[in-house]
């Protein structure tokens, strides 16, 4: 039986990066939980911004620097930067720390696995055909520069009595090659028939390591 490894975890320090940059021996677990709470807070309140990644840095015990990678940064920035001020104040009120915020625009959101997975989940929840949604996502990713993409959905697809798994793969997907830059993410669609799981792998090319 084949053993599966997380595509991003497999490449950490080579072609993929950690989602946080800090070290603390005594408060490691506390900071780790707080990082996740910060990410959940931002994604929940600014879901329409198309947030693919929230990178957290802690230069000292009191300050937290947050870099937000978004497909629609204007929603976060707001008019004359008012949105950033509002977000910073909300974070400081909820987490009792000083926050610095940096917004980075994603040039090709169609090749971000997390955004593709979330988009598919939202469309399936709205009763769109999972086959059409998957094929359109694959076409869009390849058109925007992806070298290969695989999408897998599992569950009671189209309301079927028996759960099953279906997947589409187009292009290359060299999962065993460490220099290959592979983005991976998962999402869940909650339908009246039950939960449908979505997994997305996107191959973006090779990187010198």
Swiss-Prot record:
Top-level lineage group: Bacteria
GO terms of molecular function: mRNA binding; rRNA binding; structural constituent of ribosome
One term under GO cellular component: cytosolic small ribosomal subunit
One Gene Ontology term from the biological process aspect of the record: translation
Coiled-coil parts of chain: none
SUPFAM superfamilies, sorted: Prokaryotic type KH domain (KH-domain type II) (SSF54814), Ribosomal protein S3 C-terminal domain (SSF54821)
Matches recorded under CDD domains: KH-II_30S_S3
Entries under PANTHER family matching the protein: 30S/40S RIBOSOMAL PROTEIN S3, SMALL RIBOSOMAL SUBUNIT PROTEIN US3C
Subunit record text: Part of the 30S ribosomal subunit. Forms a tight complex with proteins S10 and S14.
Family recorded in the similarity comment: Belongs to the universal ribosomal protein uS3 family.
Protein name, UniProt field: Small ribosomal subunit protein uS3
Organismal lineage: Bacteria, Thermotogati, Thermotogota, Thermotogae, Thermotogales
